[in-house]
Design a protein with these regions (language model features):
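Electron-transfer interface patches adjacent to heme c in soluble/periplasmic c-type cytochromes
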Residues: 14-40, 50-64, 68-117, 124-128, ...
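Solvent-exposed, charged amphipathic helical/linker segments at domain boundaries
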Residues: 129-146
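Bacterial N-terminal signal peptides
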Residues: 1-9
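Intrinsically disordered low-complexity regions specifically enriched for long asparagine
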Residues: 10-12, 47
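Generic detector of short alpha-helix boundary/capping microenvironments
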Residues: 2-3, 33, 135
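Hydrophobic, well-structured mid-protein blocks that either form specific transmembrane helices
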Residues: 118-125, 134-138
Length: 252
């Protein structure tokens, strides 16, 4: 009901700036409900972060890039290479590593909604920080190169890819929203994770990428897979220096 109400109001407003529209919907929701969905999910994520796993440890024992339990600004530096796993990880996959390697959960016990909630909580600690994603290790450079290849690739029955929408057709509309300049001025990397008020969903960039693939009728990469991590790194690196205005964000 909430999503339908907000979407109805948005559509009635016609062709408006997406960011200004999001601000209006956010204010409307805050005035009617008294709290934002993002805040509720962050609180849930905080509880999960401090929950003990089968090993008796909480996520405070995990290193998200700046040392055990250090969260301030950590998400703004991801994806990055981690020595303990010998691979590049983003926030989502690092949370899974934490839950399985440190907390003792079995892979099949890791719930996606819990990963997203914890991602919202950890990301909230990077609000106001600048994006600082590096390409220092060979693993990072190799994954970035894969991300570049995937971003510019065209395939499928429609002969389209990421760059079709987000380079060639920037500013044009296929629906309500214009295609974002994800490699340039829009700094789209700083827009996720986010609450999508149009469909009442909580998404990280992994979910956003999978949805994009679905929109162009391509098979969706698996969660936490190399293709998703590669595209994330390719999107994050150009955003270096951009300030995270608000994580988790509130978007259409």
């Amino acid at each position: 009901f909430l999503a339908a109400l907000l979407l109805g109001v948005a559509l009635a407003q016609g062709d408006v700036d997406p960011r200004e529209e999001a601000k209006r919907q956010k204010e409307l929701l805050l005035s009617t409900a008294g709290i934002l969905p993002t805040e509720l999910v962050v609180m849930q994520g905080e509880e999960l972060f401090h929950r003990k796993g089968p090993s008796g440890k909480t996520m405070a024992e995990c290193d998200f890039g700046l040392g055990k339990g250090v969260l301030e600004g950590a998400a703004a530096r991801l994806p990055r290479y981690f020595l303990d796993t010998n691979r590049v990880e983003d926030l989502d996959s690092r949370i899974v590593t934490c839950m399985t390697r440190v907390q003792g959960f079995k892979p099949e016990e890791v719930k996606r909604d819990e990963v997203v909630a914890v991602a919202f909580y950890i990301a909230s600690k990077s609000t106001g920080h600048k994006i600082q994603v590096r390409l220092l290790f060979p693993e990072e450079r190799e994954l970035y190169a894969l991300g570049e290849k995937l971003f510019w690739a065209r395939s499928g029955a429609r002969d389209v890819g990421c760059a079709t929408c987000h380079v060639s057709y920037v500013g044009r509309r296929a629906g309500v929203l214009p295609y974002a300049d994800v490699l340039g001025k829009d700094k789209s990397w700083t827009h996720w994770p986010a609450y999508r008020y149009s469909n009442d969903q909580t998404w990280t960039m992994q979910d956003r990428i999978r949805a994009c693939y679905g929109n162009i009728a391509h098979p969706q990469p698996a969660l936490y897979s190399q293709p998703i991590l590669a595209l994330e790194l390719y999107l994050a690196y150009p955003a270096n220096g951009a300030v995270v205005e608000e994580w988790p964000a509130f978007v259409r």
